[in-house]
């Protein structure tokens, strides 16, 4: 967890809405310039605006670092390929199984497991590229692992498939969360330390949260330097939020806030 997350977050909607407004209200003069303002100047202006909106300088000082991290910090911690001890690949969406008669408009009402789809194929391509440079064990979520097996003939010698979605009798599909996948990977090895230094491969917009989740489970997780992560979106994805970047980013930031909120509540009130 980043040190900036070690404060108590306000959980009221009254705090969140002005905070979002503050993000959009950062100096019009600064936005008019081609050069982005510095992180320090951004935080100064956010603090000033939040203090006006909330009329509480203490709370503004607490909330601003969270907003700056979640809204404005998307860089990834990275390591050289030579330092990688294992690869962890998280999937990103999927496509409805054509054989089941389902399509993107039918949502999760399917009679069989979905198809990996083009984005997970791109993630698998990135994993394969990395394996060529550093042949280590790959722990890949099912959608990615299925492509690695079919397209690149990877086997149990260097690939472990993790957590497929489940299809209920009524056609409802349940997808594992990043937390579930990370926990399942560690269960295979017994400890996170046994994985060594981990390179996380997934969609670029999910990578920050995927690395944070991996670290929360004890993994020494990073992005791999020199590996280009997928940035495309699939308009035919089963999940509506995964079809467009604007929708996905809102979804991802919401999940970051939810994780932060749960963590801070657990820290402050461990007994409930």
Where are these regions (language model features)?
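C-terminal capping/extension of enzyme domains
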Residues: 232-272
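Sequence-pattern detector for short linear motifs
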Residues: 7-8, 32, 264
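C-terminal segment of N-terminal export signals and the immediately downstream linker at the start
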Residues: 1, 22-36
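A structural signal for short, hydrophobic/glycine-enriched beta-strand patches
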Residues: 31-244
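Residue-level detector of solvent-exposed, low-hydrophobicity positions
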Residues: 14, 24, 97, 255, ...
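Bacterial N-terminal signal peptides
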Residues: 18-19
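N-terminal secretory signal peptides and thylakoid transit peptides that target proteins
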Residues: 1-15
